[in-house]
């Protein structure tokens, strides 16, 4: 199974695509599953799940990207929202109590609210070691080194904020088409991550589009 477990919809506030468009793009490029992990809301994820419920060989995993008081954590597999501003430890406890797993996204990218040094001893379930915005950067290398050292499962994800970036980085794992199976597959540690950097021209194009939209 090939999944992109970190995509943003327009409900994030800093992205542009609708959940429906994200599903269509994801199927077009051959993904088996996605997670829409919007900032501090499940709205985009829940809407996508409803739209995808009757699709064959494709699934949407519920998720959100929670802002803790130390940085971002992706809550994968939850259907109850978690409030922002809690400590990472309390956030992780809530994620697990709701049946999900906690992933550290772009952990060493400070300006995007990564957990940075705080992640080193944190009881996290998986680490995003390949993020399409930083594929050649030091931050991914540090994330990979930490995951290897602590034997934490690795995640690859696009962190897409627009359609053209979806699937830029992905995670490959053995799983059935169920949330429980995907979570089990990640926790097994038997994941492969691969992909390419989101082209800079696409990032700049989207930044310009968002500025025009706000003006």
Give, region by region, the residue ranges found by the protein language model.
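Aromatic-lined carbohydrate-recognition surfaces of secreted/lumenal glycan-active proteins
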Residues: 103-111
């Amino acid at each position: 199974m090939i999944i992109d477990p970190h995509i943003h919809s327009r409900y994030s506030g800093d992205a542009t695509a609708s959940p429906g468009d994200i599903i269509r793009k994801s199927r077009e490029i051959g993904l088996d599953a996605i997670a829409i992990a919007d900032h501090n809301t499940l709205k985009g994820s829940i809407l996508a799940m409803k739209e995808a419920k009757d699709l064959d060989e494709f699934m949407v995993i519920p998720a959100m990207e929670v802002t803790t008081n130390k940085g971002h954590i992706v809550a994968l597999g939850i259907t109850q929202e978690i409030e922002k501003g809690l400590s990472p430890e309390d956030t992780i406890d809530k994620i697990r109590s709701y049946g999900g797993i906690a992933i550290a996204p772009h952990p060493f990218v400070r300006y995007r609210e990564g957990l940075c040094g705080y992640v080193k001893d944190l009881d996290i379930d998986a680490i995003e070691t390949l993020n399409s915005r930083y594929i050649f950067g030091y931050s991914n290398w540090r994330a990979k080194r930490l995951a290897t050292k602590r034997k934490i499962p690795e995640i690859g994800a696009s962190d897409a904020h627009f359609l053209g970036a979806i699937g830029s980085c992905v995670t490959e794992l053995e799983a059935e088409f169920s949330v429980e199976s995907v979570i089990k597959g990640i926790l097994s540690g038997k994941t492969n991550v691969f992909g390419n950097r989101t082209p800079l021209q696409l990032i700049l194009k989207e930044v310009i589009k968002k500025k025009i939209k706000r003006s």
